[in-house]
Amino acid sequence: MPKKCRHLLQTSDLSLDEIKLLLNKASVYANDFNAVSLETKEKMHNKIIVALFFENSTRTVSSFEIASLRLGAKIVKLNMQTSSTSKGETLIDTFKNIHAMQPDAIITRHAFSSAPFKLAEFSQCPLINAGSGMSAHPTQALLDLLTLYQHFGGLENLKGKKIAFIGDVKNSRVANSNIKLLQRLGLEIMLCAPSSMLPSTPLRTTHNIEEAIAFADILMSLRTQTERHNAPIFASLKDYGNTYCITQKRLSTHAKNKEIIILHPGPVHRDIDIESAVLEDKRSKVLEQVKNGVAMRMAVLEFLLSD
């Protein structure tokens, strides 16, 4: 095991030059998943990566698994519902036991915001945060940035662009990571949600989706995270969607004189977060985000493991 290693717990762990390096490498992989150099394949060939997901995941865990395999590494994905944590073993003890088996990297997701930072204290191999509570999801922010980088033609073209986050911003680790990263790159940010879904923030906010659409070059829709709510905020998700769904009508009325793109980290609540017709529209970049998830996670794993 390496004596020194890098972790990726939040986007601030990366310098701007490192972010540019990841974007360049991920762009190559997004264009061709098989464009892995022989040198990289040789370095990754005997690497063993463990995925410890204590929360459900479809896109993130699958894309990390595919990214690992495309690089030539092996990945062990543990089912935490059938692990010893269900018998009362603590998070720290589970991690220490897996760590004792000397994997080359560990990818973790947990409901507690502090979990990856605590685990990093014990880790002598690269630790990647695949989502921690409401705090951080760095690889999601990086793949979203890759999607913007591709669409607008480089980082230099992102400065001054306007992005509106619409939905459950307060409970979204995706929004939190994206906001911190995009602020570093000079984007203007607006948050749009009912009061109960907005964090305390100096950023510009609105309760009006029409205002957000008129403001933005980029819309980032967010799922309503009812599992993190102490009490119902709306009578139903349909009632929420009536007020905050991104629809063709709203776009044609309030974004008719400009190009606008729409992102969502998934899972999408169709006709609640985004109207089905909008999801199929060329302005929707949702499936590009999914593809870019594999490419960016390939770049991240290569960056952390190609020693």
Swiss-Prot record:
InterPro entries: Asp/Orn_carbamoyltranf_P-bd, Asp/Orn_carbamoylTrfase, Asp/Orn_carbamoylTrfase_sf, Asp_carbamoyltransf, Asp_carbamoyltransf_Asp/Orn-bd
Species assigned in the record: Helicobacter pylori (strain G27)
Organism placement in taxonomy: Bacteria, Pseudomonadati, Campylobacterota, Epsilonproteobacteria, Campylobacterales
Reactions mediated catalytically: carbamoyl phosphate + L-aspartate = N-carbamoyl-L-aspartate + phosphate + H(+)
A cellular-component GO term for this protein: cytosol
Assembly description: Heterododecamer (2C3:3R2) of six catalytic PyrB chains organized as two trimers (C3), and six regulatory PyrI chains organized as three dimers (R2).
Name the record gives this protein: Aspartate carbamoyltransferase catalytic subunit
PROSITE patterns on file: CARBAMOYLTRANSFERASE (PS00097)
NCBIfam families: asp_carb_tr, PRK00856.1
Alphabetized GO MF terms: amino acid binding; aspartate carbamoyltransferase activity
Gene that encodes it: pyrB
Entry similarity comment: Belongs to the aspartate/ornithine carbamoyltransferase superfamily. ATCase family.
GO biological process: 'de novo' pyrimidine nucleobase biosynthetic process; 'de novo' UMP biosynthetic process; amino acid metabolic process
Binding site residues for carbamoyl phosphate: 59-60, 109, 137, 140, 266-267
